[in-house]
Swiss-Prot record:
First and last residues of every PFTB repeat: 149-190, 589-629, 638-679
Annotated EC: 5.4.99.41, 4.2.1.128, 5.4.99.39, 5.4.99.34
Protein name, per record: Lupeol synthase 1
Family of the protein in this entry: Belongs to the terpene cyclase/mutase family.
Active site: D483 (proton donor)
Reactions that this protein is recorded to catalyse: lupan-3beta,20-diol = (S)-2,3-epoxysqualene + H2O; (S)-2,3-epoxysqualene = lupeol; (S)-2,3-epoxysqualene = beta-amyrin; (S)-2,3-epoxysqualene = germanicol
PANTHER family cross-referenced by the UniProt entry: LUPEOL SYNTHASE 1, TERPENE CYCLASE/MUTASE FAMILY MEMBER
Pfam families listed in its UniProt record: SQHop_cyclase_C, SQHop_cyclase_N
Disulfide bonds, paired cysteine numbers: none
Its biological purpose: Multifunctional enzyme that converts oxidosqualene to lupeol and 3,20-dihydroxylupane. Minor production of beta-amyrin, germanicol, taraxasterol and psi-taraxasterol.
Keywords from the named record: Isomerase, Lyase, Repeat
GO CC annotation: lipid droplet
Length: 757
């Protein structure tokens, strides 16, 4: 059986190192001897259940580790369930019953180090490049044994669409990019080309013109594999890093994620690296094209993209720049003497940046796309070197196993989920159920704060300060995030107001000051707050977005969600520390409020960048406005936000928004009559922020009834549609959200309806 391990220590692996003894690390191990017949049967039943319902609910319920934790803690619900047939039956007792049942279940899921585990997956282009990299380097079977590979195959099969293709994410229609990547992944994992899944996928690809229509990222990876030719890819010259840093197109100016993707890509492109041409690679050249491989016009193929993948079409200026690099610049840089005088130096510089990122992130890197590229670049530089071995040691940090198989996560969301969990438990006001969990969670947050800036002259490496930050996952990751820092800071401040005997010693004041300093540094002149770094690029740089299937990839920008989190954290901080940077904090909050008001859409909502979508951002926006002292009577933006929510409430009392809202950038209700419990919780809390309980309780009663009646027998809530998002088109499955937010919403509802009133 598979078991989730919460890690301390490195197991004597000399290639693993940590800043805090691996607090928060999550890895999966397979134990052939583990599990009773009943436990193994329960796992198989969970797998069958997902497979049978995979086209109805695309995201897994993340059951394997939950079953393990509940078993280890000998969890029994013990509290009978109460339901409400109408809103008149929603009493203090009914609400408290559902809340207590949910809290009892949720606290049993807390890990020993204080965080709440949970997968963060969804995109179907995460896993294949990892398999490609390990196949090229000859480490596939060394890193992933037969049990790993079986679960990977399960995941790929479970998420194949009925038409034979794979979507950009688990709920998406089929696209060429992910269909090709997952087809090749199946073949590398040993599947026969005539096996049903392969056969249907290959037919989907060929029906749309073959693999020459794959988007740019796909052309890049296929060139590395030797299934495509480098001459058919768009140039990614490493010399861009050698340009003067003041130039607007310098990589140091662009969004950190794109920067950390482009640097290893430019190294591999600059070397025109191609992996071993194995018999399988030769077969793939035959299987994926409509014409003989040797006769393909690669120059023409460079501009061919499947219509299913096109979200962001290249503007003319980008194509002109690409043509100039391809036809005039690259021929010079790849010939003597410039190949020695310039290209070699550029390649050395890119590796310097790669090693810097690797060391400062403990070889986790900023995310899974970058991880694989950096790992492959290290192997190309030195196949037997320690850099590559250190990368191999951190692969388990990215892998996750559930009833739908093994997948690769974007990276962990340990801190993010834990911050929300603590706030939900605090709101529940059930100390007999939550005190121990709050203390453990407090310890995790304290242990996870980044205590220093990146090493050395970090500004010359285009990094921002990180001292005082919290990351999305754990301290070892190292990358500061504004909203993660704000949510963790809120937790520290809220817990500091409680007895240390209950929740542990509060964090040092200086560490709080460091966090405030970081948050203030990430605010732009327009009042909005960026996610990772201050804005360095002009907005027009988005014209050079090299992907066809994502948007907003080039420029660090301000986000309503981040801005709201920071308002709430700074407002709480100034109440507890009124003399620390008082004027700066007050001014920061004023500007942030103005930014939120300025970014409201005509229908009263706000666009969500990190969740689905308008409901998500509206919850944040109204929470930020309320924290800053805005009220329904005095603030037009708040009244318009309330109007949006009340007019989108469904007949069952809940809310449901389609993930298509993210790409279409307009509110689109989800299909069918069923509401989404997580989105219902966001909307419910947003209304509570605005004082809805003082105006009309009926919308809140209706939403509470839906949440209470949807609770499962054991205190869990059902998994529904995907609700996380990034870069307009990519969706993320946060499995823990289905517990955190319904509990939090019920807690806030109980407080304002039955306790305050």
């Amino acid at each position: 059986m598979w078991k989730l391990k919460i890690g301390k220590g490195n197991g004597e692996d000399p290639h693993l190192f940590s800043s805090n003894n691996f607090v928060g690390r999550q890895t999966w191990k397979f134990d052939h001897k583990a599990g009773s017949p009943e436990e193994r049967a329960a796992v198989e039943e969970a797998r069958r259940g997902f497979l049978d319902n995979r086209f109805r609910v695309k995201g897994c319920s993340d059951l394997l580790w939950r079953m393990q934790f509940l078993r280890e803690k000998k969890f029994e619900q013990g509290i009978p369930q109460l339901k409400a047939t109408n809103i008149e039956e929603i009493t203090y007792e009914t609400t408290t019953n559902a809340l207590r049942r949910g809290v009892r279940y949720f606290t049993a899921l807390q890990a020993s180090d204080g965080h709440w585990p949970g997968e963060i997956t969804g995109p179907l282009f995460f896993l294949p490049p990892l398999i490609f990299c390990l196949y090229i380097t000859g480490h596939l079977e060394e890193v992933f044994d037969a049990e790993h590979r079986k679960e990977m195959l399960r995941h790929i099969y479970c998420h194949q669409n009925e038409d034979g293709g794979w979507g950009l994410h688990i709920e998406s229609k089929s696209v060429m990019f992910c269909t090709v990547l997952n087809y090749i992944c199946l073949r590398m994992l040993g599947e026969n080309p005539e096996q049903d899944a392969c056969k249907r996928a290959r037919q989907w690809i060929l029906d749309r013109g073959g693999v020459i229509f794959i988007p740019s990222w796909g052309k890049f990876w296929l060139s590395i594999l030797g299934v495509y030719d480098w001459s058919g890819t768009n140039p990614t010259p490493p010399e861009l890093l050698m340009l003067p840093s003041f130039l607007p197109i310098h990589p140091g100016k662009i969004l950190c994620y794109s920067r950390m993707v482009s640097i290893p890509m430019s190294y591999l492109y600059g070397k025109r690296f191609v992996g071993p041409i194995t018999p399988l690679i030769l077969l793939l050249r035959e299987e994926l094209y409509l014409e003989p491989y040797e006769e393909i016009n690669w120059k023409k193929s460079r501009r061919l993209y499947a219509k299913e993948d096109m979200y962001y079409a290249h503007p003319l200026v980008q194509d002109l720049l690409s043509d100039t690099l391809q036809n005039f610049v690259e021929p010079l840089l790849t010939r003597w003497p410039l190949n020695k005088l310039v290209r070699e130096k550029a390649l050395q510089l890119t590796m310097k940046h790669i090693h810097y990122e690797d060391e400062n992130s403990h070889y986790i890197t900023i995310g899974c796309v970058e991880k694989v590229l950096c790992m492959l670049a290290c192997w190309v530089e030195n196949p037997n070197g320690d850099y590559f071995k250190k990368h191999l040691a951190r692969i388990p940090d990215y892998m996750w196993v559930a009833e739908d198989g093994m997948k690769m996560q974007s990276f962990g969301c340990q801190l993010w989920d834990t911050g929300f969990a603590i706030q939900a438990l605090l709101a529940s006001n059930l100390p007999d159920e939550t005190d121990d969990a709050l203390k453990r969670g407090h310890n995790y947050i304290k242990a996870s704060q980044v205590r220093e800036n990146p090493s050395g002259d970090f500004r010359s490496m285009y990094r921002h300060i990180s001292k005082g930050a919290w990351t999305f996952s754990d301290r070892d990751h190292g990358w500061q995030v504004s909203d993660c820092t704000a949510e963790a800071l809120k937790c520290c401040l809220l817990l500091s107001m409680m007895s240390a005997d209950i929740v542990g010693q509060k964090i040092d004041d200086e560490q709080l000051y460091d966090s405030v300093n970081l948050l203030l540094s990430l605010q732009s002149g327009n009042g909005g707050v960026n996610a990772w770094e201050p804005s360095r690029a002009y907005k027009w740089l988005e014209l050079l977005n090299p992907t066809e299937f994502m948007a907003n990839t080039m420029v660090e920008r301000e986000f309503v969600e981040c801005t709201s989190s920071v308002i709430q954290a700074l407002d709480l901080f100034r109440k507890l520390y009124p003399d620390h940077r008082k004027k700066e904090i007050n001014r920061s909050i004023e500007k942030a409020v103005q930014f939120i008001q300025d970014n409201q859409t005509p229908d009263g909502s706000w666009y969500g960048n990190w969740g689905v979508c308008f409901i998500y951002a509206t919850w944040f926006a109204l929470g930020g406005l309320a924290a800053a002292g805005e009220t329904y009577n005095d603030c037009l933006a708040m009244r318009n936000g309330v109007h949006f929510l009340l007019t989108t409430q469904r007949d069952d009392g809940g809310w449901g928004e389609s993930y298509l809202s993210c790409s279409e950038q307009r509110y689109i209700p989800s299909e069918g009559e069923r509401s989404n419990l997580v989105q219902t919780s966001w909307a419910m809390m947003a209304l509570i922020h605005t004082g809805q309980a003082e105006r009309d309780l009926i919308p809140l009663h209706r939403a509470a009834k839906l949440i209470i009646n949807s609770q499962l027998e054991n205190g869990d809530f059902p998994q529904q549609e995907i609700v996380g998002a990034f870069m307009n088109t990519c969706m993320l499955h946060y499995a823990t959200y289905r517990n955190t937010f319904p509990l939090w919403a019920l807690a806030e509802y109980r407080k304002v309806v039955f306790i305050v009133n």
